[in-house]
Every structure is written in structure tokens, then in C-alpha cells.
Amino acid sequence: MASLREATLRKLRRFSELRGKPVAAGEFWDVVAITAADEKQELAYKQQLSEKLKKRELPLGVQYHVFPDPAGTKIGNGGSTLCSLECLESLCGDKWNSLKVLLIHSGGYSQRLPNASALGKIFTALPLGEPIYQMLELKLAMYVDFPSNMRPGVLVTCADDIELYSVGDSEYIAFDQPGFTALAHPSSLAVGTTHGVFVLHSDSSLQHGDLEYRQCYQFLHKPTIENMHRFNAVHRQRSFGQQNLSGGDTDCLPLHTEYVYTDSLFYMDHKSAKKLLDFYKSEGPLNCEIDAYGDFLQALGPGATAEYTRNTSHVTKEESQLLDMRQKIFHLLKGTPLNVVVLNNSRFYHIGTLQEYLLHFTSDSALKTELGLQSIAFSVSPSVPERSSGTACVIHSIVDSGCCVAPGSVVEYSRLGPEVSIGENCIISSSVIAKTVVPAYSFLCSLSVKINGHLKYSTMVFGMQDNLKNSVKTLEDIKALQFFGVCFLSCLDIWNLKATEKLFSGNKMNLSLWTACIFPVCSSLSESATASLGMLSAVRNHSPFNLSDFNLLSIQEMLVYKDVQDMLAYREHIFLEISSNKNQSDLEKS
């Protein structure tokens, strides 16, 4: 049995061989499609894909597309899937029935991982590879074996998760059955409450191994532990070793414990995709949020019932049309088989929050070992200190030898001078800092913005524990918001700002740190970081810092005004400097 590490390395090597080269027919995906929240995000994604192809960082001869959600009501990843199928048909015509498509859901503005907000979760940098792998390349690498063992259809996945698996030397994952096929990972019951859980047909004749092909009787979406037992989704640990029963976001399950099989990606054959597309065309524009997992997969398998269509506990916004739409999807898909590829030696990781990001990149996590993540990845940097609790992580950055980055912190796409000290558990992204002490648990991310045709810079800063999504309805309630653990109203006093409606961008219905216009606009990256760190320092020291002299933006506005081309040019400048430094270093060694 190959270890996860060996299996993962083989996939990375295989993908590396395909980067920058034309792929043979059937060897790779025909289409790689990424969803976007809106046209602004679509443009940002297209610009980055174009740069990647120019630099030959992706396999060539593949159609790379970005499909934005239509303006208006949020439609969820299920709605995005339906829109994407329509886009595919309009782009490819009748040919789409012979295509193998990878569809990656990456719409949304990553409020829980704001360093991915400007350029997208699928373009999150990883401490791996030269040039640096982003989540897109990792997805393509981890799925590199799939297309050659797949019938035409669509594989649906999310931008912020990682699936690692190992199967026997002569085994492979095949997506060749009619209907839907999903991957399943053994996980604790606690993990099951936040995922989809498969109720499998019992098969006493089955030989248990790393890879099993099973039929799903019923799919449960984020079930309670009580319901997992009630619907017979719970298994007892078998003889295949402790290391296999680890959901990546959890510790290893102890022996003789209970576990469930949880979901990750799923595939639908062309016939099923066409059925969904025809349904979407007949329904017209969507006016409610559809979940690709909760609303599609729960309709599948012989045990599916319409009961879930009335459960709205996992819906962010209950539209009047939602229940009706769920009923229609249930009747459309009922009777469609759900095949399950059980991967007993696999892990599933989620990197969609600041805490998960720091955990996997800086601590001694299983993902770090299995993926070969580095502490210093494609950077000019002094060695970083290590402690039992973890290490710092430096990605695509230039860090002066006199700079100190504490364990537990991540620095990406940044330039740090000799008199900079970064505290523990910080994230510093796309920033230029010449001289300062950044306190522990700080988040700092700089953006290029174009306002009235002028290129400027703004840096968002806040505490790692701050909740950007937490919102209030009225100005009287903004005292409930916190900035770096301090009452937001007190912060406004320190910054000489008044709590008026003008302080917030957007519809004024949801007042939050996300929509608060508190971040200075400056003429350079370094000035921008200095100004934002000044406002943070003032709050920590309870000393005045006059923000009323600055033009101010909210994070929401930064994303509207962002200048993607300038941000990519800045990264390229760092890339060239690192490459030059490495070449010089290699010459000196030889």
C-alpha cells in the first residue's frame, strides 16, 4: 500500500510533466471551468488564467473558462452549476456531450479568508513548487489521473478543499457509471455533522481495501449524530489500520471507534448533466439559493425522500421559491443512481478560513507532511525559527536577513525590510513593510486600487479573531462590532471618525467591518501598510490617530476598485527578483 505522501508526490510529478506542454487527446481535461460571483470577479480570474498560460504554468491545449453568476439573487453553488452547464452548451454546441469537464466553484468574496478576497480562493498561494503552486494547480495535480478513466461528463469540486488519497498499484478511480459518482472519505461523526454523509448499501461479500466501489442508498446533508445512527450511516472500525481513518481536518480516529463516510467532489455523466440543463432552461432565471450537494445529491439513491426539501436549517437565506425549487429538483433526479468511490486511505482538508490556513501552513500538520509543504517556498529569506508548536511560512516573498518572522505566521507576496518584526500567528499578504513591529494575531493585506483613473494602494488590517461577517442593522448597534478585540465605537473615537451612515459602503442594511470605510488610500504600497499599521497601533495603545485626513475605503470598496493587472505586475517583479537571486546563488555555488 503506497503511503499518501508517495501517492501525492507521484501526482505532483505527473502534473509537473504536463505544465506548459500541449496535452494529448484524452490525457487531460477538455475543459476546466471556474465559477465567479460576478463579472468583476470573472475579469480578475480571466486575467490570472491568461498570465498563467503566458508563463506556461498550466497544461496547454485545454479550454479554460470562467463562468460568472448572473446579477441579482444569490443562487448558491447549485445555481452556479446550472448556469455553467448552460454556458458550456452555448460555447461548445453539440460537442459538449463528448467533453470531460472539471467545474471548480470559486464564486464569493472569501470573508473568512480575506487574503483570497481580491484574486480568488482558487488562486490562493501554497508553500509548494517553483514557481509557486496555487490552489488551481494543486487541484489539477490531485485529479491528474481522473480524465483518462472517465466518460464524458462534469466533475464538480470546490476551490478551498484538498483531497489526498492512495490506492493500490494496479487500482485507479473510474468515473464510468451512469448517474452521479461521489468520492467518500472515512471521517469522525463530528466531521460528518458539517459534511454530506453517505448511507451505503450493505455488502457482506465485499473485500475491504483502499478502494471500494459501492452504491449509495441515501445521502444525508450535514446530519445530526442521532440521524447518522438512525439512518444506518455509522460504521465500526475494521481491520485496516488506524492511519486510514483520519478525516484530514480531524485527529486520527482511535481504534474500535465509530466513523462515517463523508463527501468531497462528485461527478455526473453527460445524460444527468443534460437533464439538469434542460430543467434549468425550462425554469428560467433562478430566484433562490441552490446547494449542489444538499439539493442534488439528497435527491439520489433509492432511499431518498422529499423530507429534506422542507428543511431550511442550512440555507443562508430562505427565499419564497426555495421549497418549490427543491421539490422540483427532487422529482427530476429521483431514481438516479449515486455511485460511491470509497477511499479508505484518504484525507480531506479544508482551507477556507484564517485559522485553517495558519494551521496547515505553519503547524506540524499531516497536510504539511503529505503534500511536502515548505517553510520557505520560492523566496529570498533567512531561515525561519521553529518551535514545537510550529514554524513561520514564507511564500513568494523577499525578506531581509535582519527581519524576524515569528512561528505560526505566514508571509506571502511581500517585501519585508531589516527592521521589521512580525509577531506570532499573523498573515502578511502582498505588503511592503520597511520598518515596524507587527503585533501578534494581526492580519495585513494590501491591494492596488484604481480610483478615477489613478493608481493608489490600500491595506486592510484587523485582528485574526475579528469577525468580518458579523453585522448590525443600525448605527446604535455598532458598539457590538470589534476591531482587534476593541469596541468599534471606541476605535472610531481614536481615529477621529464619526459613526454616520457615510462611514459604511453598500446598502447600509448590514453594517460590519467588511463595509466600514476605515482603511487609508495612499500613493505607494509601503505608505499604505504604514498608515494601516498606524491605525492598528493607535487602537492597541489608545492613542489618537487622525484618519479623517485620508481618503478611506472599506474592504468591500477595495474589491470594487482593485487593479488586478497592477497586483500581478507587482508579484511578477518579486518573481523576477527572486529568480535573479537564485540564479546568482547557483552561480556562486558552482
UniProtKB/Swiss-Prot annotation:
**Top enzyme class of this protein?**
transferase
Where, subcellularly, is it found?
Cytoplasm
Q: What is its EC number?
A: 2.7.7.30
Q: Which reaction does it catalyse?
A: beta-L-fucose 1-phosphate + GTP + H(+) = GDP-beta-L-fucose + diphosphate
Annotated GO biological processes are: GDP-L-fucose salvage; L-fucose metabolic process
Tissue specificity annotation: Expressed at highest levels in brain, moderately in testis, ovary and kidney, and weakly in liver, spleen, heart and lung.
Judging by the UniProt lineage, the source's domain of life is: Eukaryota
The yes or no answer to whether the keyword Transferase is present is yes
One GO CC term of this entry? cytoplasm
Gene3D superfamilies from the xrefs? Hexapeptide repeat proteins
Q: What are the UniProt keywords, alphabetically?
A: Cytoplasm, GTP-binding, Nucleotide-binding, Nucleotidyltransferase, Transferase
- Answer yes or no on keyword Nucleotidyltransferase: yes
Q: Listed GO molecular functions?
A: fucose-1-phosphate guanylyltransferase activity; GTP binding
Q: What is its main location?
A: cytoplasm
> InterPro entries this protein is in?
Fucose-1-phosphate_GuaTrfase (IPR012120), GDP_fucose_pyrophosphorylase (IPR012887), Trimer_LpxA-like_sf (IPR011004)
PANTHER family for this protein: FUCOSE-1-PHOSPHATE GUANYLYLTRANSFERASE
Q: What does this protein do?
A: Catalyzes the formation of GDP-L-fucose from GTP and L-fucose-1-phosphate. Functions as a salvage pathway to reutilize L-fucose arising from the turnover of glycoproteins and glycolipids.
Question: What name is this protein filed under?
Answer: Fucose-1-phosphate guanylyltransferase
As recorded in Swiss-Prot or TrEMBL, the protein's gene is named Fpgt
